[in-house]
Curated annotation (Swiss-Prot):
Gene that this polypeptide is encoded by: speA
GO molecular function: arginine decarboxylase activity; metal ion binding
Keyword Transmembrane: no
Biological process (GO), any one: arginine catabolic process
Protein name, per record: Biosynthetic arginine decarboxylase
Similarity comment: family membership: Belongs to the Orn/Lys/Arg decarboxylase class-II family. SpeA subfamily.
UniProt KW keywords: Decarboxylase, Lyase, Magnesium, Metal-binding, Polyamine biosynthesis, Pyridoxal phosphate, Spermidine biosynthesis
Modified residues (N6-(pyridoxal phosphate)lysine): 109
Organism, scientific name: Prochlorococcus marinus (strain MIT 9215)
UniProt-annotated binding residues for substrate: 291-301
Cofactor(s) required for function per UniProt: Mg(2+); pyridoxal 5'-phosphate
Annotated pathway: Amine and polyamine biosynthesis; agmatine biosynthesis; agmatine from L-arginine: step 1/1
Reactions that this protein is recorded to catalyse: L-arginine + H(+) = agmatine + CO2
């Protein structure tokens, strides 16, 4: 019997090794680190020494019957992100002697959760922080939550007459809605609403910029972009507003060049074009007051500070400086007052505060044991594989001859393929085919155990690592909790939240609970590149192995779906105290199976009754005892009240 054990790389694994492996010092933005116990720590804000132990927090939440998978939102990090955004603009305003203010709004579409929006409004109140809405439903949220009469409510999206009427009348409540014209036909609807209501709204225009964008959302600009008015349409809109005596309500220019802009040069070009449009609108007689630079402020998911899709080649301060300086230059060249600057920086505000935690249910990998059979009657193909295996064993502890190893590996693959052909033709039994596959894995493990990382990553050998990798079964639905991983191949930082004093000598990826081959996490950050396998620990018997997915606060909950009927996870809002302790502020309980089924018009009572009728028939036919029927119904009723995830 031959045993193949995972290859340990270091004798004394340190926290520094874990930091290097998972690059937490690069993407963590000082909010996340590893403590002396080998657990992830979460910091109150980037200037604070106050931290809490994330692993300890999750265990204590479990003792409260708040199980994984769960989302933990750190209110202090959310507050710090809002403060950091305003501090950056305040510094830029002071540096460039800008003669107006920055007044941000949060795009509700990034995270519509009530507790989140209430905190954003609370934390942003010193700066009259407002909201941006893109539908009538979001408009109603904004009108209900925004009580500060100095806060702005930017009204974007498609607008029918009712949308416009609601926003217009809300102005009489002391609210500050600005209706942004994004489609040309909205002009007539605004004019009709004004005539019907005898009330006027504040008006803005979204410009369809010609400046090129970058990244996944580059089509947000250009002639074929979904929203915005072309320059000729802007000119005709100004003419129509003048004819309707509404030009004095025209106050804002808005543009948006896409989400998660990675290259600061793209932002600069757009700012220059938009600033000049703002100047021209002023010259055309509009009493302009605001310029809304939209979203696009990116965050550094992979920590490389580059212009890749998962990073940014600029800092928050760089961004604020360029916004302030560019708009100032355009206005001063034309003797125009500096406008109030608005941004819709959703991802940069909300991403860092949310961490998704899940537990590993189990693992699968190729067999680690092999018994070599020396049978003279066995197939020649099998004999060839055995001979290849022994040739590889002879190379153990000898000077590595990489070309020879590659040749032997190619031989092993060819012999395995020959076995498959023979099996299809009926010349090889199922047992022989299984033996051939085990021998091929054995060859792969011999090679892996004899080579270092650089050697095993040779293009002709890299598939060995993939072959030997473990699949870690994750107690979550990717489609529900991190849909961007599936939909657009978004990369989030992923790592264990504990055991960082131990070497993670296994390599693996994650499979979720859904019956879908797309339900896999197999793309991980790797010094600016993407790797398909993550260093992981061997799960311990009867102990949770907990994994964190970081920076998930934007869009994921709104976009998540009910694939295979996995519902909302537990959500917990945490305040970090000054004494390294915490306070649980809010708990939003996970969906039960009954609640999920109700969304699809299934009555739990009807389902149970239908099954009960079946059990009665089975009892009559002597297929089921009364005791078995009762037990089945009891289990179903209990299950309906429980989570859709595996926490029972």
């Amino acid at each position: 019997m031959t045993n193949f054990e995972p290859k340990k790389l270091k004798k004394n694994w340190t926290i520094e090794d874990s930091i290097s492996t998972y690059e937490i010092d690069k993407w963590g933005d000082k909010y996340f680190s590893i403590n002396s116990k080998g657990n992830i720590s979460v910091t109150k804000d980037i200037n604070s020494e106050k931290k809490i132990d994330l692993f300890k927090l999750v265990r204590e939440l479990k003792s409260r019957e708040i199980n994984t998978p769960l989302i933990i939102r750190f209110n202090d990090i959310l507050k710090d992100r809002i403060n950091a955004l305003h501090d950056a603009f305040l510094k830029a305003i002071k540096t460039y002697k800008y003669k107006n203010i920055y007044q941000g709004v949060f795009p509700v579409k990034c995270n519509q959760q009530k507790n989140v929006l209430e905190k954003i409004i609370e934390f942003g109140s010193p700066w009259n922080f407002g909201l941006e809405v893109g539908s009538k439903s979001e408009l109603l949220i904004g009108l209900a939550l925004l009580e500060n009469q100095n806060s702005l409510l930017i009204c974007n999206g498609y607008k029918d007459k009712k949308y416009i009427e609601i926003a217009t009348l809300a102005r009489k409540l002391g609210k500050n809605p600005i209706i942004v014209i994004e489609q040309k036909d909205e002009v007539n609807r605004i004019i009709e609403a004004v005539q019907d209501l005898n009330a006027s709204p504040l008006i803005g225009i979204r410009a369809k910029l010609s400046s090129k964008s970058s990244g996944r959302w580059s089509k947000s600009v250009g002639d074929n972009s979904k929203f915005g008015l072309s320059i000729p349409e802007i000119m005709s809109t100004i003419k129509e507003l003048k004819e309707a005596n509404l030009i004095n309500e025209m106050r804002l220019l808005h543009f948006h060049i896409g989400s998660q802009i990675s290259d600061i040069a793209v932002i600069k070009d757009a700012l220059q074009e938009a600033s000049q449009i703002y100047v021209e609108l002023f010259k055309l007689g509009a009493p302009m007051k605001y310029i809304d630079v939209g979203g696009g402020l990116g965050i550094d998911f992979d920590g490389t500070k580059t212009s890749s899709n998962t990073s940014t080649n600029y800092s928050l301060q760089n961004y604020a400086n360029d916004v302030i300086a560019t708009i100032k230059d355009s206005c001063e060249l034309n003797n125009i007052e500096h406008p109030t600057i608005i941004s819709e920086s959703g991802r940069a505000i909300i991403s860092h505060c949310s961490v998704l935690i899940f537990n590993v249910l189990g693992t699968s990998h190729v067999s680690s044991k092999l018994k070599i059979y020396d049978d003279k009657k066995q197939s020649l193909i099998i004999s060839n594989l055995i001979e290849t295996f022994y040739e590889l064993k002879k190379l153990k502890n000898k000077k590595i001859n990489l070309s020879q190893i590659i040749e032997l590996w190619n031989d092993a693959k060819k012999f395995k393929e020959d076995c498959l052909v023979a099996f299809r033709l009926g010349f090889l039994s199922l047992a022989e085919r299984a033996y051939a596959e085990e021998l091929t894995w054995a060859c792969a493990k011999e090679i892996a155990n004899n080579l270092n990382n650089d050697e095993i990553n040779h293009p002709d050998l890299f598939e060995i690592t993939e072959t030997l990798a473990s699949t870690y079964y994750a107690n979550l639905s990717i489609f529900k909790s991190i849909p961007d991983c599936w939909a657009i191949n978004q990369i989030f930082p992923i790592m264990p939240i504990h055991r960082h004093l131990e070497e993670p000598f296994c390599k693996g990826n994650f499979a979720d609970l859904t019956c879908d081959s797309d339900g896999k996490l197999n793309s991980f950050i790797n010094n600016g590149k993407i790797k398909s396998l993550l260093n992981l620990h061997e799960p311990e018997q009867d102990k949770d192995y907990l994994i964190g997915i970081f920076m998930t606060g934007a869009y994921q909950e709104a976009l998540g779906n009910l694939h295979n009927l996995f519902g909302n996870t537990n959500v917990v809002h945490i305040d970090i105290n000054q004494n390294d302790s915490y306070k649980v502020k809010n708990i939003i309980k996970e969906d039960s199976k009954s609640e999920i089924l109700q969304l699809l018009d299934y009555s739990s009572a009807s389902l149970v009754e239908s099954i009960r009728i079946n059990t009665e028939a089975a009892i009559d036919q002597k297929k089921l005892t009364i005791e078995e029927a009762r037990k089945l119904i009891d289990q179903i009723e209990i299950s309906l009240r429980k989570s859709s995830y595996l926490s029972e």
